[in-house]
């Protein structure tokens, strides 16, 4: 797309902000263009509460979960907290298609992104090979129960949608878990 010339003056504060971000974006034009794209995004209605929520997750190590899951956890029903969690709905909402059309890899990649955003895990890695795919998750809560709880979410969806095509090998520890899925022949 052709560029258009713009000549203007900026306050000292605005210029300092541009200088601060120049190394990340490459130059003044790129900083201004990135800022304009940010201003023009569709969901530009971040409220102060939205920003507070982001800061709680990032700065104070909060995590997020659905209300019904939270209720089941408070009531001590971990099985219901997993089986009735919003994971299935959230994945379909994010991918904009029903689970019948979602491949195992798509599901795992979506979980990876969601868990990172919600601060559920500290590290997630998905690797693939010929006929297999593996998810490795690590967390700093250092409790086997946490690892089991997280793995149960994926295994619950696996049982519903992928068990017919894939076998799974599980490894769960106090620091995280590995689930390796092998395509059935």
UniProtKB/Swiss-Prot annotation:
**Domain of life per record:** Archaea
Query: Could you identify this protein by its name?
Result: Uncharacterized protein AF_0136
Which classification does the entry list for the species? Archaea, Methanobacteriati, Methanobacteriota, Archaeoglobi, Archaeoglobales
